[in-house]
Amino acid sequence: MRESGTLFQRFCFAQASFESSRHVYRREHGPGQVRRFFNTSFTAFELRRYMMNFYFIKGSFTITELVEVSEFSRPTVTSTVHEALELGYLEELSGTGDRRRRDFRPTEPMLEAWRNYCNALLANPEFSRVLKLAQALMSMRELEAQPSGNDV
């Protein structure tokens, strides 16, 4: 248990270091309007993560879904989505049948910005270190959770 605690401390440190080094993405990938929009506020930055998660899981998202997972207020989420929509980073899907349910998905510029972000992560040695520590921690916790054969 002590080893996993020490490893967890190292993981927390590495993750904090990685999270504070987002400048790597900014430096390695030229200026882009999408990145600027989503990095201008904490709300927009966090919502982008949820938008992309829903996009890769099911192809689209609604404002209600973003409100539920983000715990931001509906007006805040709605404002951010509509601003991204006006700037052309999101598009509204048509043909859902229910006028109350509005589905959105990222446009190609936003998807390209996300791919650039992911490429920057993979090029960042700190990200690789954090990922390896996380994998080691998960394996150790799985082993610790398994009942010992000697307890019979």
Where are the regions that the model predicts?
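N-terminal leader segment of winged-helix/HTH proteins
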Residues: M1-F38
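A short, conserved structural fragment
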Residues: E86-T96
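Short amphipathic alpha-helical elements of helix-turn-helix/winged-helix folds
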Residues: Y50-F54
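Amphipathic alpha-helical dimerization/coiled-coil segments
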Residues: R115-V152
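Short coil turns linking two alpha-helices in DNA-binding domains
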Residues: F72-S73
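Short acidic, hydrophobic short linear motifs in intrinsically disordered regions
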Residues: I57-E68
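Short, cationic-aromatic polyanion-contact patches
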Residues: T40-T43, G95-N119
